[in-house]
């Protein structure tokens, strides 16, 4: 109770909010045209609520857009957009579309097909569901209009799409939204673009082509207007402080080669073909002969370790390595990793509990005030309520 009270009373001066990955399809798909608003749902697109995207409220899976059916009766607002992930659609989101059709709501569902359950590790959705199949499913729900928007529309030229389905390039997304918001009834945009994290994994594994082209911003030409960030909403476009003021640069390690930042009205971009990232020079092996072997404490009860850091920097990798080390050493580890969104730049924590084989533990979560060690890879996250709640002056 004392630990819980300390955690609740603690007010951190700043919080880390996660952001979409570089090249995330939601960078484009969650935009709304001027004068319109959107509603969120379950998925990484949930993060649009704390971005400048006029996206408000969210529901449980299968409830996307349902509140608008009631709200629309008491407002002069004529239309709303609703974001709906493909995994959620397969789970129960189709029921939300069905109720909207039955209610005669003026609403546009944006079904975001990213080919993976990105927020829990990039697994495929629990069943077969292609963009072509979605067009047929919503067509038979009797929606007013269906538009398939893709970064590679040419792959669907001869596809079996539902009758009346329009095929548009993602560069036309704003035009498509302006058209559909004026169509009475329920309309659907099937937005097809592979999850950025999954695209990066596939390129590393050699199962997806890696474009031989990179973009570089010439700081001598850049005026720091930020239009590249406005157009792309990409986390790989970073501020660059110079003697002439703040400019922009592209973090080449983060960039996933989407090139949407090129849409910015700017002459400072340089396109490089055949260029590769310069590798760090190999360092000599560290001399660890003078480092004494650590004294491993005898575990009489569960030993609890909390890791706190920034998403995308390897916090979950470290927790997995420590858990495997405990397993190799004959101990019984349990790990609870923070999941639910692609936490790029956001706060991430992992609970690692280690016990003896003859004294197993029942739950992976560290109880309030029970952490033996906190590895704070980032001071902001280590100072968060969630982390302070685990600490105790007598034990941590």
Residue locations for each model-derived region?
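Thiamine diphosphate
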Residues: 1-119, 124-132, 175, 280, 287-390
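Glycine-rich ThDP/TPP pyrophosphate-binding loop and its adjacent helix/strand module
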Residues: 116-207
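Short beta-alpha connecting loops at secondary-structure transitions
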Residues: 52-56, 116-127, 131, 157-165, ...
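C-terminal accessory/binding modules appended to enzymatic or scaffolding proteins
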Residues: 16-29, 34, 215-243, 303-306
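ADP-ribose/adenylate-binding Rossmann-like module
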Residues: 391-396
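Long, charge-rich boundary regions
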Residues: 253-327
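Iron-sulfur cluster-binding cysteine motifs and their immediate structural context
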Residues: 193-194, 198-205, 223-280
């Amino acid at each position: 109770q004392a630990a819980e009270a300390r955690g609740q009373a603690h007010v951190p001066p700043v919080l880390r909010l996660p952001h979409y990955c570089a090249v995330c399809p939601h960078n484009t798909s969650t935009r709304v045209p001027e004068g319109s608003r959107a509603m969120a749902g379950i998925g990484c697109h949930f993060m649009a609520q704390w971005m400048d995207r006029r996206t408000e409220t969210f529901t449980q899976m299968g409830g996307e857009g349902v509140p608008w059916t009631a709200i629309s009766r008491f407002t002069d607002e004529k239309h709303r957009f609703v974001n709906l992930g493909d995994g959620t659609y397969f789970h129960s989101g189709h029921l939300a579309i069905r109720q909207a059709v039955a209610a005669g709501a003026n609403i546009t569902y944006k079904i975001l097909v990213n080919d993976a359950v990105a927020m829990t590790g990039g697994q495929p959705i629990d069943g077969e569901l292609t963009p072509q199949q979605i067009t047929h499913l919503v067509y038979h729900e009797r929606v007013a209009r269906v538009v398939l928007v893709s970064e590679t529309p040419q792959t669907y030229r001869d596809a079996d799409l539902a009758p009346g389905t329009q095929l548009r390039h993602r560069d036309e997304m704003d035009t498509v939204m302006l058209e559909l918001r004026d169509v009475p009834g329920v309309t659907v945009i099937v937005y097809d673009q592979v999850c950025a994290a999954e695209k990066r994994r596939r390129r590393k594994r050699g199962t997806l082509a890696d474009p031989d082209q990179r973009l570089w911003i010439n700081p001598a030409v850049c005026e720091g207007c930020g239009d590249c960030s406005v157009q792309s909403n990409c986390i790989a476009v970073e501020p660059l402080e110079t003697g002439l003021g703040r400019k922009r640069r592209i973090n080449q390690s983060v960039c996933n080669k989407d090139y949407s930042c090129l849409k910015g009205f700017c002459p400072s971009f340089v396109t490089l073909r055949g260029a590769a990232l310069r590798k760090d020079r190999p360092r000599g092996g560290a001399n660890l002969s003078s480092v004494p072997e650590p004294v491993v404490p005898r575990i009489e009860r569960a030993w609890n370790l909390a890791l706190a850091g920034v998403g995308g920097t390897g916090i979950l990798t470290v927790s997995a390595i420590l858990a495997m080390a405990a397993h190799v050493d004959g101990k019984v580890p349990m790990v609870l990793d923070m999941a639910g969104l692609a936490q790029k730049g956001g706060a991430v924590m992992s609970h690692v509990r280690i016990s003896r084989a003859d004294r197993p533990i029942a739950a992976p979560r560290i109880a309030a005030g029970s952490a033996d060690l906190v590895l704070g890879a980032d001071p902001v996250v280590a100072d968060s309520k969630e982390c302070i709640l685990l600490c105790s002056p007598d034990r941590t």
